């Protein structure tokens, strides 16, 4: 049977860690390795986790809790867990979320039968103790999926609700970067999808909590935006080095516009975006769109051009003779 490593960073989740950990320990699948990374959490999260382990003696021997000497952020915590993992596949579980009891079993069964690099499952959003409607993964070819991801704001760049083949991660050194704590999943997933092959399952394998106001997704601060800009720059670097046929150039430049849209909406100086990205788009239209945003044209008006162009691109890549 395949061994699955579940990787969970812990910081400031004493309200949620018990519910999360119980869902992990009560999985129907046996060969699981649990790696929790304590990123110097200031609350009682680790104590709650350690007390809970007494109720699951059969799982306790499968658990490792790694402590950071100082708070280093979620990017570093994910990387610490990744490097400690020994499983055939990795499953990222955030410490305020939950898994259905048969989630790992269903993902592992599909991995075993398909030998795919990425097994992508369905999920439900969780709010106020209730699960929302089922969200299924995009059922499109791998190359198109990556282009949609890189365009940004079309499909999610989530790490959770999936399992990733560890050997492919190590072979291509697909690592997280300390200091990128928001949108760290964007450039990480793009790299994995560039090399890997994906299959889907329709079963719900993850409950994604939307009512935790302390999560990164609820705090779009300037600090988080700067992290997102850095993630986008890493994306540019990766494709400049590896996309020799420029298959993802247009998608990358469409995604770059998103950084300026976010900056405008958050009133972040455009100079900070320019400095972080350090990139001049090849497309004249993309340069024009960015210029309009920087000149103060309302984003809603610029979107009339930008979203139409993005929509046209997504239609073209779906055509039989797809464009780059």
Where are these regions (language model features)?
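Membrane-interface aromatic/basic loop that binds lipid-linked glycans or pyrophosphate carriers
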Residues: 267-324
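Residue-level detector of alpha-helical secondary structure
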Residues: 50-53, 108, 236, 240, ...
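Nucleotide-sugar donor-binding/catalytic module of glycosyltransferases
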Residues: 1-230
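Generic detector of well-ordered alpha-helical segments enriched in charged/polar residues
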Residues: 146-151, 236, 253, 274, ...
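A compositionally biased, intrinsically disordered/low-complexity signal enriched
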Residues: 97, 102, 245, 251-252
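Catalytic core of nucleotide-sugar-dependent glycosyltransferases
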Residues: 197, 204-212, 218-250, 258-283
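Alpha-helical scaffolds flanking conserved acidic
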Residues: 185-186, 250-254
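Helix-centric, low-specificity signal for extended rod-like, repetitive segments
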Residues: 71, 155, 254, 284-287, ...
């Amino acid at each position: 049977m395949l061994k699955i490593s579940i990787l969970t960073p812990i910081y400031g989740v004493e309200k949620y860690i018990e519910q999360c950990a119980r869902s992990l320990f009560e999985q129907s699948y046996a060969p699981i390795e649990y790696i929790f990374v304590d990123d110097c959490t200031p609350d009682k999260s680790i104590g709650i986790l350690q007390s809970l382990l007494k109720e699951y003696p059969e799982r306790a021997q499968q658990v490792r809790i790694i402590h950071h000497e100082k708070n280093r952020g979620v990017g570093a915590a994910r990387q610490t867990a990744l490097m400690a993992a020994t499983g055939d596949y990795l499953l990222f579980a955030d410490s305020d979320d939950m898994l259905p009891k048969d989630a790992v079993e269903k993902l592992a069964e599909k991995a075993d039968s398909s030998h795919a690099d990425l097994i992508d499952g369905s999920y439900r959003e969780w709010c106020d103790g209730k699960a929302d409607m089922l969200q299924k993964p995009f059922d499109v070819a791998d190359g198109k999926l990556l282009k949609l991801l890189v365009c940004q704001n079309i499909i999610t760049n989530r790490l959770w609700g999936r399992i990733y083949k560890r050997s492919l991660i190590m072979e291509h050194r697909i690592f997280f970067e300390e200091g990128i704590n928001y949108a760290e999943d964007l450039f990480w997933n793009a790299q994995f999808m560039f090399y890997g092959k994906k299959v889907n399952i329709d079963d719900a394998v993850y409950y994604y909590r939307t009512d935790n106001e302390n999560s990164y997704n609820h705090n779009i601060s300037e600090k988080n935006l700067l992290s997102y800009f850095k993630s986008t720059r890493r994306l540019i670097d990766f494709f400049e080095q590896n996309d020799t046929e420029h298959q993802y150039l247009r998608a990358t430049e469409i995604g770059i516009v998103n950084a300026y849209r976010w900056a405008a909406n958050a009133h972040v100086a455009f100079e900070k975006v320019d400095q972080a990205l350090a990139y001049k788009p090849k497309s004249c239209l993309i340069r024009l769109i960015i210029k309009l945003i920087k000149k103060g044209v309302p984003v809603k008006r610029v979107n009339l051009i930008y979203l139409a162009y993005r929509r046209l691109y997504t239609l073209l890549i779906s055509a039989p003779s797809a464009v780059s």
